[in-house]
UniProtKB/Swiss-Prot annotation:
The reversible ADP-ribosylation of Arg-100 inactivates the nitrogenase reductase and regulates nitrogenase activity. It catalyses: N2 + 8 reduced [2Fe-2S]-[ferredoxin] + 16 ATP + 16 H2O = H2 + 8 oxidized [2Fe-2S]-[ferredoxin] + 2 NH4(+) + 16 ADP + 16 phosphate + 6 H(+). One of its GO terms (biological process) is nitrogen fixation. PANTHER family: LIGHT-INDEPENDENT PROTOCHLOROPHYLLIDE REDUCTASE IRON-SULFUR ATP-BINDING PROTEIN. The keyword Nucleotide-binding applies. Keywords: 4Fe-4S, ADP-ribosylation, ATP-binding, Iron, Iron-sulfur, Metal-binding, Nitrogen fixation, Nucleotide-binding, Oxidoreductase. This is Nitrogenase iron protein 1. Its EC number is 1.18.6.1. [4Fe-4S] cluster binds at C97, C132.
Length: 275
């Protein structure tokens, strides 16, 4: 049965890069059939899988061809490791609601049975924080059963992770969605691992993996590839391989217990994130 995973995190945290490298590792190292559904108007959730290509989005296709012509063969492309890719896209700048585009795109994919076809994993790569009902849809309506949050030892990344947990709690009991853990995408700040470990303990989850910072990630991006495609034998590829394995084998799913603002302030002061 296909496992549906939503990846959340603060804008700029490296969420899409982490998600694409994890998906590539699942396919390349673990032989899994994977699909990525990008839920960001920037439509950059799949470009490393597609060799740098910015694929035509579902919303663009809807505007140009109409709903009847917006079929899977028009909007799904296959990239590295046989990973299937689709991008929701969004409205024209300054017009309409991008969150609504996510709702429309997911509904259309479900109508065509796309998420059920011979897949092991579907990743929903969701814009930034839980900012509105549209972007909360994978949580709210049970489209995803598992949530992973990408964070770091930086203050705003932790605040965003805590806010995402607050959004999860609101919908978890009705939708059945659960938190699978925090992925630390390291920024090499002092005490980062210890801070994230305590944060995870305080909210009742696990740090499923600590991804070290490595310049090969940027080098691979410059070459329009995931790290796994660029150099599958390098140390960073092995980190993503391990992260993928941990997600595949994960059985530790919880409804988190978000921290209060005062508790968050105390935590970041304790580790010197605030002076």
């Amino acid at each position: 049965m296909v496992r549906k995973i939503a990846i959340y995190g603060k804008g700029g945290i490296g969420k899409s890069t982490t998600q694409q490298n994890t998906a590539a590792a699942m396919s390349y190292f673990h032989g899994k059939n994977v699909m990525i559904h990008g839920c960001d108007p920037k439509a950059d959730s799949t470009r490393l899988i597609l060799g740098g290509k910015m694929q035509t989005t579902m919303m663009d296709t809807l505007r140009e061809l109409g709903e009847g012509a917006c079929t899977p063969d028009k909007v799904i492309e296959t990239g590295f490791g046989g990973i299937r890719c689709v991008e929701s896209g969004g409205p024209e700048p300054g017009v309409g609601c991008a969150g609504r585009g996510v709702i429309t795109a997911i509904t259309l994919m479900e109508r065509h049975g796309v998420y059920e076809n011979d897949l092991d994993f579907v990743f929903f790569d969701v814009l930034g924080d839980v900012v509105c009902g549209g972007f909360a849809m994978p949580v709210r309506d049970g489209k995803a059963e598992e949530i992973y949050i990408v964070a770091s030892g930086e203050m705003m990344a932790l605040y965003a992770a805590n806010n995402i947990c607050r959004g999860m709690v609101k919908y978890a009991r009705q939708s059945g969605v659960r938190l699978g853990g925090i992925i630390c995408n390291s920024r090499n700040v002092d005490g980062e691992r210890e801070l994230l470990e305590e944060f995870c303990e305080r909210i009742g989850t696990q740090m499923i993996h600590f991804v070290p910072r490595d310049n090969i990630v940027q080098k691979a991006e410059f070459n329009k590839k995931s790290v796994i495609e660029f150099d599958p034998e390098c140390n960073q590829s092995q980190e993503y391989r391990e992260l993928a394995r941990k997600i595949i084998e994960n059985t530790d799913f919880v409804i988190p217990e978000p921290m209060t603002m005062d508790e968050m302030e105390d935590l970041v002061v304790k580790y010197g994130v605030l002076d």
